[in-house]
Amino acid sequence: MALSFLELMELRVVKALVDRDVTLQHVRRAAQVAAERFNTKHPLASRRVFTDGRHIFSAVTDAAEAPDVVKWTAAEIDQVVAGPVFDQFLSEIEFDSATSLASRWWPLGRQVPVILDPAIRFGAPVVAGTGVRTSTLARLARTTSVRDVAVAYELELAQAHAAINFEQQLSTA
């Protein structure tokens, strides 16, 4: 079974919530309400609906700078909290300005040059700005030095290391 990029983003949110004891029933209910409220098939992949890992929230406004957000609790859906709390979570994801849906993900944060973008290599993890798959670099690094891999693909050594480390983390997960 293949997942779309948006489904992957939604599963990331669901996993984070379930790992912190939020019930699937609550996640499902919140997703259904958000899908209707924001007219989207992928509410948990939307900039307007996001999580801090324990709760589900939705943006009250589309303001770019620290919008107020609505916290969705099991008992009540409209509890406003401050937007800046979620800067770290939202900073890992780039959202499409037209749809407000996730369009690019930095799975280790923006400081690490590894991205998933459905428009690049069908969403496979790549070195940002290059389109070079992290899996290709990791595979080559098993038989040659990281420096040689970086030179072969015209990457900085730090980019090659980041890609290889990312793949190693995937293999141990």
Model-found features: residue ranges?
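Long, charge-rich, low-complexity intrinsically disordered regions
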Residues: 2, 10-13, 18-143, 147-151, ...
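Conserved AdoMet
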Residues: 5
